[in-house]
Amino acid sequence: MRLGFSAWAMSTMPVRDQISLVHGLGYQAIELVGGDTDALNPMTVTDTEVRDIRRALDDSGLELPSIACHGNLLETDPAVRAHACARVIAGMELAVRLAGPSGPPCVVTMGFGLPEQFDTHRQQIADNFAELARAGAHLGVIVALEPHVGQALDLPDRVQWVLDAVGSPNFRLNFDNSHFEVMGCDFHAYVPQLTRYAVHTHMKDQRGIAPGFEFLVPGEGTFDYAAYLPVIEKAGYNGAITVEISKMVQNRPDYDPAEVAARSYRTLTDAAKRGGVTFAPVA
């Protein structure tokens, strides 16, 4: 496994600066973030900018395992839905343009909806992801579902249902376990259940159970990374363990992405040592 950091923590910072920050702290991978208000907008980024980003990645030695690019395909307004779908597909096209030696990164996106809508909306959600998976198959890109507390796909069984319902190798899982943790789930159960679908992960810390929960910087809560990392490795995962900093943290008045990135690095590398897990460098 490799230790990564998500540009979600600093998505409006120039992309070269994102890469420089993550590389300078010792991480081995970076997740880029593409959206309408981010420094990297998949719908407007030029070929020159893409080449510059790829060059910066190559110079740094950082792996690019993922691009986060969210779009709500449950929107009822046809124009809004069309824009959301176009943004995610543009993210998939960007993944192809930024592909490195190991191929294009996956594209992470959420299912949206509300928990109480799962039964009524699950087929539409599956159809939405099947649509994206077909586009991914054409482009050679994997779409990775991000489960999310407060959304329809908030529990391991629901996540497994939609993954199996779509049944495409181009539709896999971005394993963000924090959302399961604040739902009161036990990683000794959900890791064996879902790891076989995982192509990428997010890691953060958390406190409390939904609805009274808070996402935190790794190390601020009580989550046992030294116990978790060997479990997910034993389950067969060998990709990036990518730190994601929640908007809850970013909204703090003293928020500093470089400081939380450095602190997260120390927390995860220490936990890996205590758990007997080695983060391998990029080949």
Model regions and ranges:
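A generic structural signal for short
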Residues: S6-A7, N41-P42, A79-V80, T120-H121, ...
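Conserved beta-alpha-beta core of the PfkB/ribokinase-like small-molecule kinase fold
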Residues: L145-E146, L173
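Active-site-proximal loop/turn and secondary-structure-junction residues that shape catalytic pockets
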Residues: A9-S11, G34-D36, G71-L73, G111-P115, ...
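Histidine-acidic metal/acid-base catalytic patches
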Residues: M1-G4, S11-Q28, R51, D58-S60, ...
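Structural motif corresponding to the early beta-alpha repeats
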Residues: Q28, L32-D127, I142, E233, ...
